[in-house]
Curated annotation (Swiss-Prot):
<feature type="transmembrane region" description="Helical">
    <location>
        <begin position="276"/>
        <end position="294"/>
    </location>
</feature>
<comment type="function">
    <text>Binds to chondroitin sulfate on the cell surface to provide virion attachment to target cell.</text>
</comment>
<feature type="topological domain" description="Intravirion">
    <location>
        <begin position="295"/>
        <end position="304"/>
    </location>
</feature>
<feature type="topological domain" description="Virion surface">
    <location>
        <begin position="1"/>
        <end position="275"/>
    </location>
</feature>
<keyword id="KW-0945">Host-virus interaction</keyword>
<keyword id="KW-0812">Transmembrane</keyword>
<dbReference type="GO" id="GO:0004089">
    <property type="term" value="F:carbonate dehydratase activity"/>
</dbReference>
<protein>
    <recommendedName>
        <fullName>Cell surface-binding protein OPG105</fullName>
    </recommendedName>
</protein>
<dbReference type="GO" id="GO:0008270">
    <property type="term" value="F:zinc ion binding"/>
</dbReference>
<keyword id="KW-1015">Disulfide bond</keyword>
<keyword id="KW-1160">Virus entry into host cell</keyword>
<comment type="subunit">
    <text>Homodimer; disulfide-linked.</text>
</comment>
<dbReference type="InterPro" id="IPR023561">
    <property type="entry name" value="Carbonic_anhydrase_a-class"/>
</dbReference>
<keyword id="KW-0946">Virion</keyword>
<dbReference type="InterPro" id="IPR036398">
    <property type="entry name" value="CA_dom_sf"/>
</dbReference>
<feature type="domain" description="Alpha-carbonic anhydrase">
    <location>
        <begin position="1"/>
        <end position="235"/>
    </location>
</feature>
<comment type="similarity">
    <text>Belongs to the alpha-carbonic anhydrase family.</text>
</comment>
Protein backbone atom coordinates (compact mmCIF):
# COMPACT_ATOMS: atom_id res chain seq x y z
CA UNK A 1 0.00 0.00 0.00
CA UNK A 2 1.24 3.55 -0.71
CA UNK A 3 2.28 5.73 2.19
CA UNK A 4 -0.37 7.99 3.72
CA UNK A 5 0.22 11.55 2.55
CA UNK A 6 -0.13 14.42 5.02
CA UNK A 7 -2.06 16.43 6.06
CA UNK A 8 -5.37 14.66 6.70
CA UNK A 9 -8.82 15.30 8.11
CA UNK A 10 -9.12 13.49 11.45
CA UNK A 11 -12.54 11.96 12.01
CA UNK A 12 -12.75 11.69 15.78
CA UNK A 13 -15.42 8.97 15.72
CA UNK A 14 -13.14 6.73 13.68
CA UNK A 15 -10.03 7.26 15.81
CA UNK A 16 -8.92 4.20 17.77
CA UNK A 17 -8.22 4.29 21.49
CA UNK A 18 -4.78 2.92 22.32
CA UNK A 19 -3.65 2.21 25.89
CA UNK A 20 0.00 2.66 24.85
CA UNK A 21 -0.54 6.35 24.24
CA UNK A 22 0.66 7.64 27.58
CA UNK A 23 1.31 11.36 28.23
CA UNK A 24 4.34 12.75 26.45
CA UNK A 25 7.38 13.98 28.33
CA UNK A 26 8.14 17.35 26.76
CA UNK A 27 11.51 18.86 27.63
CA UNK A 28 11.66 22.27 25.97
CA UNK A 29 13.11 24.10 28.98
CA UNK A 30 16.60 23.96 27.46
CA UNK A 31 15.54 24.66 23.87
CA UNK A 32 16.85 27.90 22.39
CA UNK A 33 15.88 29.42 19.03
CA UNK A 34 18.98 30.19 16.98
CA UNK A 35 17.71 31.60 13.68
CA UNK A 36 14.41 32.53 12.05
CA UNK A 37 13.92 32.14 8.30
CA UNK A 38 11.56 33.21 5.55
CA UNK A 39 11.95 30.30 3.14
CA UNK A 40 9.70 31.97 0.58
CA UNK A 41 6.97 29.51 1.50
CA UNK A 42 6.82 29.51 5.31
CA UNK A 43 8.44 30.76 8.51
CA UNK A 44 10.93 28.38 10.08
CA UNK A 45 12.69 28.78 13.42
CA UNK A 46 15.72 26.56 14.04
CA UNK A 47 16.37 25.31 17.57
CA UNK A 48 19.23 24.03 19.62
CA UNK A 49 18.37 21.76 22.54
CA UNK A 50 15.02 20.40 23.67
CA UNK A 51 13.53 16.95 23.15
CA UNK A 52 10.45 14.79 23.65
CA UNK A 53 10.17 11.29 25.09
CA UNK A 54 7.67 9.08 26.91
CA UNK A 55 4.25 8.28 25.52
CA UNK A 56 4.63 5.66 22.79
CA UNK A 57 8.11 6.90 21.77
CA UNK A 58 10.92 4.30 21.93
CA UNK A 59 13.51 6.93 22.91
CA UNK A 60 14.24 10.66 22.83
CA UNK A 61 13.51 12.75 19.76
CA UNK A 62 15.47 16.00 19.49
CA UNK A 63 13.75 19.25 18.47
CA UNK A 64 15.02 20.54 15.14
CA UNK A 65 12.71 23.33 13.96
CA UNK A 66 9.36 25.09 14.25
CA UNK A 67 7.31 25.83 11.13
CA UNK A 68 4.22 28.01 10.82
CA UNK A 69 1.31 27.78 8.37
CA UNK A 70 -1.61 30.17 7.76
CA UNK A 71 -4.32 31.17 5.27
CA UNK A 72 -5.65 34.25 3.48
CA UNK A 73 -8.40 34.60 6.08
CA UNK A 74 -8.51 33.98 9.82
CA UNK A 75 -11.17 31.28 9.39
CA UNK A 76 -8.81 28.79 7.76
CA UNK A 77 -5.08 28.19 7.66
CA UNK A 78 -4.27 24.87 9.31
CA UNK A 79 -2.97 21.87 7.41
CA UNK A 80 -4.80 19.26 9.46
CA UNK A 81 -8.54 19.30 10.12
CA UNK A 82 -10.54 17.92 13.03
CA UNK A 83 -13.95 16.69 11.82
CA UNK A 84 -13.54 18.98 8.75
CA UNK A 85 -12.94 21.97 11.04
CA UNK A 86 -9.98 24.03 9.85
CA UNK A 87 -8.23 26.25 12.40
CA UNK A 88 -6.72 29.70 11.77
CA UNK A 89 -3.20 28.33 11.49
CA UNK A 90 -0.85 25.55 12.52
CA UNK A 91 2.56 25.23 14.15
CA UNK A 92 4.65 22.15 13.35
CA UNK A 93 7.47 21.15 15.71
CA UNK A 94 9.86 18.81 13.89
CA UNK A 95 11.92 16.30 15.91
CA UNK A 96 14.36 13.57 14.88
CA UNK A 97 15.58 10.31 16.40
CA UNK A 98 19.07 11.27 17.57
CA UNK A 99 19.68 8.06 19.51
CA UNK A 100 19.23 5.86 16.44
CA UNK A 101 20.51 8.10 13.66
CA UNK A 102 23.55 10.34 13.26
CA UNK A 103 21.83 13.36 11.69
CA UNK A 104 18.48 14.82 10.71
CA UNK A 105 19.21 14.01 7.05
CA UNK A 106 19.86 10.38 7.94
CA UNK A 107 16.81 10.17 10.21
CA UNK A 108 14.42 11.41 7.53
CA UNK A 109 15.23 8.35 5.41
CA UNK A 110 13.47 6.07 7.91
CA UNK A 111 9.85 5.73 9.05
CA UNK A 112 10.88 6.01 12.72
CA UNK A 113 13.22 8.93 12.13
CA UNK A 114 10.89 11.95 12.43
CA UNK A 115 8.20 13.01 14.88
CA UNK A 116 6.16 16.14 14.12
CA UNK A 117 3.99 17.78 16.79
CA UNK A 118 1.10 19.86 15.48
CA UNK A 119 -0.33 22.79 17.47
CA UNK A 120 -3.38 24.60 16.11
CA UNK A 121 -3.70 28.40 16.13
CA UNK A 122 -7.13 29.92 16.75
CA UNK A 123 -7.82 33.64 16.29
CA UNK A 124 -9.45 35.22 19.35
CA UNK A 125 -9.98 38.69 20.88
CA UNK A 126 -6.71 38.70 22.83
CA UNK A 127 -3.07 38.83 21.85
CA UNK A 128 -0.82 35.95 22.80
CA UNK A 129 2.21 37.52 24.49
CA UNK A 130 4.32 34.41 23.90
CA UNK A 131 3.44 34.13 20.21
CA UNK A 132 4.20 37.85 19.92
CA UNK A 133 7.87 36.98 20.48
CA UNK A 134 7.81 35.35 17.05
CA UNK A 135 5.76 38.13 15.44
CA UNK A 136 8.32 40.70 16.62
CA UNK A 137 11.02 38.94 14.58
CA UNK A 138 9.18 39.03 11.25
CA UNK A 139 10.40 42.46 10.12
CA UNK A 140 13.93 41.06 9.96
CA UNK A 141 12.90 38.35 7.46
CA UNK A 142 10.36 40.18 5.34
CA UNK A 143 12.28 39.45 2.13
CA UNK A 144 12.15 35.98 0.66
CA UNK A 145 14.94 33.48 1.41
CA UNK A 146 16.29 35.53 4.29
CA UNK A 147 17.51 34.44 7.70
CA UNK A 148 18.22 36.37 10.89
CA UNK A 149 19.32 35.58 14.44
CA UNK A 150 16.42 35.06 16.83
CA UNK A 151 17.39 37.84 19.23
CA UNK A 152 14.74 37.48 21.93
CA UNK A 153 14.34 35.28 24.99
CA UNK A 154 11.78 32.68 23.99
CA UNK A 155 10.38 29.74 25.96
CA UNK A 156 8.72 27.21 23.68
CA UNK A 157 6.83 25.62 26.58
CA UNK A 158 4.60 28.70 26.62
CA UNK A 159 3.19 27.80 23.20
CA UNK A 160 1.93 24.40 24.31
CA UNK A 161 -1.86 24.09 24.61
CA UNK A 162 -3.59 23.69 27.96
CA UNK A 163 -4.50 20.06 27.20
CA UNK A 164 -1.92 17.62 25.85
CA UNK A 165 -4.14 14.73 24.78
CA UNK A 166 -3.29 13.86 21.21
CA UNK A 167 -4.05 12.07 17.96
CA UNK A 168 -1.28 10.22 16.17
CA UNK A 169 -0.82 8.57 12.77
CA UNK A 170 1.97 7.62 10.37
CA UNK A 171 2.11 10.00 7.43
CA UNK A 172 4.64 12.20 5.67
CA UNK A 173 6.19 15.62 6.05
CA UNK A 174 4.06 18.39 4.55
CA UNK A 175 6.25 18.52 1.43
CA UNK A 176 6.17 14.69 1.19
CA UNK A 177 9.96 14.40 1.25
CA UNK A 178 10.01 11.93 4.15
CA UNK A 179 7.88 9.69 6.33
CA UNK A 180 6.86 11.14 9.70
CA UNK A 181 4.86 10.16 12.75
CA UNK A 182 2.39 12.93 13.58
CA UNK A 183 1.30 13.93 17.09
CA UNK A 184 -1.61 16.36 16.91
CA UNK A 185 -2.93 18.32 19.88
CA UNK A 186 -6.61 19.15 19.13
CA UNK A 187 -6.76 21.89 21.78
CA UNK A 188 -5.61 25.11 20.05
CA UNK A 189 -3.72 28.08 21.40
CA UNK A 190 -5.31 31.51 20.95
CA UNK A 191 -3.72 34.39 19.08
CA UNK A 192 -5.01 37.74 17.79
CA UNK A 193 -5.96 38.48 14.20
CA UNK A 194 -3.34 41.25 14.03
CA UNK A 195 -0.64 38.75 14.96
CA UNK A 196 -1.60 36.33 12.21
CA UNK A 197 -2.01 39.05 9.57
CA UNK A 198 1.64 40.02 10.05
CA UNK A 199 2.69 36.74 8.43
CA UNK A 200 0.81 37.68 5.25
CA UNK A 201 3.16 40.64 4.76
CA UNK A 202 6.16 38.37 4.15
CA UNK A 203 7.44 38.21 0.58
CA UNK A 204 7.08 34.94 -1.32
CA UNK A 205 9.59 33.21 -3.58
CA UNK A 206 7.00 33.29 -6.37
CA UNK A 207 7.77 35.95 -9.01
CA UNK A 208 6.48 34.42 -12.25
CA UNK A 209 5.33 37.83 -13.54
CA UNK A 210 8.35 39.76 -12.32
CA UNK A 211 6.42 41.32 -9.45
CA UNK A 212 6.79 40.73 -5.71
CA UNK A 213 4.24 38.41 -4.14
CA UNK A 214 3.29 37.86 -0.53
CA UNK A 215 2.88 34.60 1.36
CA UNK A 216 -0.82 35.18 1.86
CA UNK A 217 -1.40 31.47 2.48
CA UNK A 218 0.73 28.35 2.70
CA UNK A 219 -1.46 25.63 4.18
CA UNK A 220 -2.10 22.33 2.38
CA UNK A 221 -5.45 20.72 1.76
CA UNK A 222 -6.00 17.31 3.36
CA UNK A 223 -5.43 14.04 1.55
CA UNK A 224 -7.83 11.13 1.49
CA UNK A 225 -7.11 8.42 4.04
CA UNK A 226 -5.65 5.19 2.71
CA UNK A 227 -7.63 2.07 3.51
CA UNK A 228 -4.96 0.86 5.94
CA UNK A 229 -4.29 4.20 7.68
CA UNK A 230 -5.10 4.13 11.38
CA UNK A 231 -5.52 7.24 13.53
CA UNK A 232 -5.14 6.70 17.28
CA UNK A 233 -6.04 8.91 20.20
CA UNK A 234 -5.16 9.20 23.87
CA UNK A 235 -7.17 10.18 26.97
CA UNK A 236 -10.40 12.14 26.60
CA UNK A 237 -9.43 13.41 23.20
CA UNK A 238 -12.84 13.00 21.57
CA UNK A 239 -14.55 15.21 24.13
CA UNK A 240 -11.73 17.77 24.05
CA UNK A 241 -11.75 17.93 20.27
CA UNK A 242 -15.50 18.46 19.88
CA UNK A 243 -16.23 21.08 22.52
CA UNK A 244 -13.90 23.91 21.54
CA UNK A 245 -15.34 27.45 21.96
CA UNK A 246 -14.53 28.22 18.33
CA UNK A 247 -16.64 25.28 17.14
CA UNK A 248 -19.55 26.24 19.42
CA UNK A 249 -19.40 29.88 18.31
CA UNK A 250 -19.50 28.79 14.66
CA UNK A 251 -22.52 26.54 15.33
CA UNK A 252 -24.33 29.31 17.22
CA UNK A 253 -23.75 31.74 14.33
CA UNK A 254 -25.19 29.15 11.95
CA UNK A 255 -28.28 28.67 14.14
CA UNK A 256 -28.73 32.42 14.39
CA UNK A 257 -28.58 32.81 10.60
CA UNK A 258 -31.09 29.99 10.20
CA UNK A 259 -33.44 31.69 12.66
CA UNK A 260 -33.26 34.93 10.67
CA UNK A 261 -34.05 33.01 7.48
CA UNK A 262 -37.11 31.39 9.09
CA UNK A 263 -38.32 34.76 10.33
CA UNK A 264 -37.97 36.28 6.86
CA UNK A 265 -40.10 33.40 5.48
CA UNK A 266 -42.72 34.13 8.15
CA UNK A 267 -42.89 37.80 7.10
CA UNK A 268 -43.03 36.84 3.43
CA UNK A 269 -45.84 34.27 3.66
CA UNK A 270 -48.00 35.61 6.54
CA UNK A 271 -50.45 37.22 4.11
CA UNK A 272 -50.53 34.33 1.64
CA UNK A 273 -49.59 30.83 2.78
CA UNK A 274 -50.49 30.99 6.47
CA UNK A 275 -49.62 27.32 7.05
CA UNK A 276 -46.09 27.86 5.81
CA UNK A 277 -45.84 31.06 7.85
CA UNK A 278 -46.91 29.25 11.04
CA UNK A 279 -44.33 26.50 10.46
CA UNK A 280 -41.65 29.16 9.94
CA UNK A 281 -42.50 31.05 13.16
CA UNK A 282 -42.53 27.76 15.14
CA UNK A 283 -38.98 27.13 13.94
CA UNK A 284 -38.05 30.67 14.98
CA UNK A 285 -39.22 29.97 18.56
CA UNK A 286 -37.44 26.59 18.65
CA UNK A 287 -34.16 28.04 17.38
CA UNK A 288 -34.42 30.96 19.81
CA UNK A 289 -34.77 28.51 22.71
CA UNK A 290 -31.79 26.45 21.53
CA UNK A 291 -29.64 29.56 21.18
CA UNK A 292 -30.65 30.75 24.64
CA UNK A 293 -29.73 27.47 26.35
CA UNK A 294 -26.45 27.20 24.41
CA UNK A 295 -25.46 30.75 25.34
CA UNK A 296 -26.27 30.06 29.00
CA UNK A 297 -24.15 26.90 29.01
CA UNK A 298 -21.28 28.62 27.23
CA UNK A 299 -21.34 31.47 29.77
CA UNK A 300 -21.18 28.99 32.66
CA UNK A 301 -18.24 27.15 31.05
CA UNK A 302 -16.31 30.40 30.62
CA UNK A 303 -16.89 31.28 34.28
CA UNK A 304 -15.58 27.86 35.34
Amino acid sequence: MPQQLSPINIETKKAISNARLKPLDIHYNESKPTTIQNTGKLVRINFKGGYISGGFLPNEYVLSSLRIYWGKEDDYGSNHLIDVYKYSGEINLVHWNKKKYSSYEEAKKHDDGLIIISIFLQVSDHKNVYFQKIVNQLDSIRSTNTSAPFDSVFYLDNLLPSKLDYFTYLGTTINHSADAVWIIFPTPINIHSDQLSKFRTLLSSSNHDGKPHYITENYRNPYKLNDDTQVYYSGEIIRAATTSPARENYFMRWLSDLRETCFSYYQKYIEGNKTFAIIAIVFVFILTAILFFMSQRYSREKQN
